[in-house]
Amino acid sequence: VEPLWTKKPADLKDEDYKSFYRHLFPMADEPLFWIHLNVDYPFNLTGILYFPKIKNNLDIQRNRIQLYCNQVFVTDAVEGIVPEFLTLLHGVIDSPDIPLNVSRSYLQSDANVKKISGYITKKVSDKLASIFKNDREEFEKKWDDIKIFIHYGMLSQDDYYDKAKQYFLLKDTDGKHYTLDEYAEKVKE
């Protein structure tokens, strides 16, 4: 059976992604959404990353992303490959371009690993921006579940902060959501 992450996103339906998630994480709630990674230049990377529904702080688990090399499982300790603020995501990444038997400090200095980490951050940011732009109401409904990723990313990575500030939300006491720019305008009034 061909692994789902090796297929083209256009050939897959939402149910395929959900079924694969249930296979990987049978006890987890349905994911909020997912990102299908598929790039072959300047490095090879395929995979599917899922945003899990996090019910409470006790539910936060790391090491839920499985690393494969040419469809052979390597590890679920992906620190250094996946940006730290995204290690709470669930899923699979597969790349022959990640050195396998090296120290964490070597990984952090490897050029391909840095590119892969940056690519994953960009894809996550693009997906969040797309949901925000195309269906803000749906984005606001998911905000309480995804804000931990966005907060942590904005605090830990300057380049992510610059991207995320466009869809970062604040909630007032009435439960209405505002972007930073909208909130600044409201305060001026």
Ranges and model annotations:
Residues 1-189:
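Conserved GHKL (Bergerat-fold) ATPase module
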